[in-house]
């Protein structure tokens, strides 16, 4: 991604998180980035395309981080622990992006449905790990969809925790608390 596109990406992410999708205009984005509309339209055909790009990049970031980390682990419990830590770290580093993903998850518009589709794909990856853990006896029998959704829900929990604590978050302390609760429930 070139410098201008990255700046549009980062600025849009911040504006969408602060103002919401509907209240953010192309003019807001171009004024904040400091580029002409033509420059923005060279990189993105519409506000909707910018939003879709943000969602896709955000989910890719989560999936790639998890794929890299979990591919090196043999234990399915360790894979779940890695997912928990990655999700907390991503909330801390990319709070605006997570705010957008969570806020746009609800609704029936095309952008909401695309967001839901990407999030469901991510949750399905978690569910595959849970199913495999059940098959080998590392994880007790249970509703794999519910378990995977709960693990994804840690993103929301971490964000709420961060906001309630004025942005202060001890990653490892929060990880230990989430990990303890989740892993106890899986064994």
Enumerate the predicted regions with their spans.
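Hydrophobic alpha-helical connector segments
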Residues: 53, 67-93, 147-151
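Amphipathic alpha-helical segments used for helix-helix packing
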Residues: 86, 90-110, 160-164
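Short hydrophobic/aromatic patch on the recognition helix
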Residues: 34-44
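Amphipathic alpha-helical packing segments from all-alpha helical-bundle domains
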Residues: 60-63, 67, 93, 111-136, ...
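Basic, helix-initiating cap at the start of DNA-binding domains
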Residues: 1-19, 24-35, 49
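C-terminal peripheral helix-coil segments that are non-catalytic and often amphipathic
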Residues: 89, 124-132, 154, 165-187
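Alpha-helical DNA-contacting segments of helix-turn-helix folds
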Residues: 52-58
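Short coil/turn segments at alpha/beta junctions that flank glycine-rich nucleotide-binding fingerprints
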Residues: 18-22, 73, 94, 136-137
């Amino acid at each position: 991604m070139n410098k201008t596109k990255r700046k549009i990406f980062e600025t849009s992410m911040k504006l969408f998180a602060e103002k919401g999708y509907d209240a953010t205009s192309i003019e807001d984005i171009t004024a904040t980035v400091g580029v002409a509309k033509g420059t923005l339209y060279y990189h993105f055909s519409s506000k909707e395309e910018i939003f879709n790009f943000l969602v896709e990049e955000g989910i890719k970031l989560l999936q790639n981080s998890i794929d890299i980390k979990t591919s090196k682990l043999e234990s399915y419990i360790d894979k779940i622990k890695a997912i928990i830590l990655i999700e907390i770290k991503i909330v801390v580093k990319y709070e605006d992006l997570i705010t957008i993903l969570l806020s746009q998850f609800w609704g029936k518009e095309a952008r909401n449905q695309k967001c839901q589709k990407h999030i469901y794909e991510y949750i399905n990856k978690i569910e595959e790990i849970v199913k495999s853990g059940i098959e080998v006896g590392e994880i007790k029998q249970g509703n794999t969809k519910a378990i995977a959704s709960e693990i994804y829900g840690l993103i929301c929990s971490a964000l709420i925790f961060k906001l309630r604590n004025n942005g202060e978050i001890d990653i490892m302390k929060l990880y230990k608390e989430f990990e303890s609760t989740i892993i106890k429930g899986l064994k």
